[in-house]
């Protein structure tokens, strides 16, 4: 039974013969709740440490994923990502017809081995966000976006003007919800 939006329930989908875990607000949550990252400082660590965001879009019912450099800001308690690229292309065409998207970032990936094949794996932090994408047209927002992107990618502040941002497209991705995960190294890893 769900009492508030932080409670969980398990739902059986007979047609798929499997169970799904769902938050009471309707969002699917991760199976390994012991690995879920909920502390904002840890989530910020993931966002600040990762350099590549994988942008997932849907093109005529088919998945389309593209790796991109990114920047992010918090606006009105919403996480907003910015990515940039050419002024024309497939991803812009897709966003114009279907703005639904997801993003994925990982960092601190460290492979480890074991005595048997099933003990091999990777320690990592990961972030998955779900929301909508839109193409930014306003020069001032493009300047803000490019500044955020360069700060994450280089740790430096750069000056932009309308002429510089007029030659790139900027995509704004507003996350409606997200999850983050940490898979630690095993107790006695063979690294």
Where in the sequence are the language-model features?
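Charged, gly/pro-rich active-site loop segments
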Residues: 25-32, 108-191
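Short Pro/Gly-enriched beta-strand edge/turn motifs at strand-loop
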Residues: 37-39, 49-54, 153-156
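Short, structured patches in soluble enzyme cores that scaffold and shape functional sites
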Residues: 57-59, 85, 105-107, 175-177
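Helix-adjacent hinge/juxtasegments
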Residues: 90-113, 118-120
């Amino acid at each position: 039974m769900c009492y508030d939006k932080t409670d969980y329930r398990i739902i059986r989908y007979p047609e798929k013969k499997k169970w799904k875990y769902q938050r009471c607000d309707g969002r699917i949550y991760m199976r390994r709740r012991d690995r879920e990252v909920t502390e904002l400082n840890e989530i910020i660590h993931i966002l600040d440490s990762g350099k590549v965001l994988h942008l997932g879009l849907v093109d005529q019912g088919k998945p389309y994923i593209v790796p991109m450099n990114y920047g992010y800001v918090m606006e009105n308690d919403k996480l907003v990502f910015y990515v940039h690229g050419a002024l024309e292309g497939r991803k812009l065409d897709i966003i114009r017809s279907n703005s639904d998207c997801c993003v994925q970032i990982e960092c601190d990936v460290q492979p480890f081995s074991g005595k048997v094949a099933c003990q091999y794996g990777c320690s990592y932090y990961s972030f998955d966000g779900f929301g909508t994408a839109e193409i930014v047209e306003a020069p001032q927002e493009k300047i803000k976006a490019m500044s955020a992107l360069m700060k994450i990618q280089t740790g430096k502040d750069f000056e932009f003007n309308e002429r510089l941002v007029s030659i790139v497209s900027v995509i704004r991705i507003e996350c409606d919800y997200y999850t983050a995960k940490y898979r630690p190294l095993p107790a006695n890893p063979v690294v």
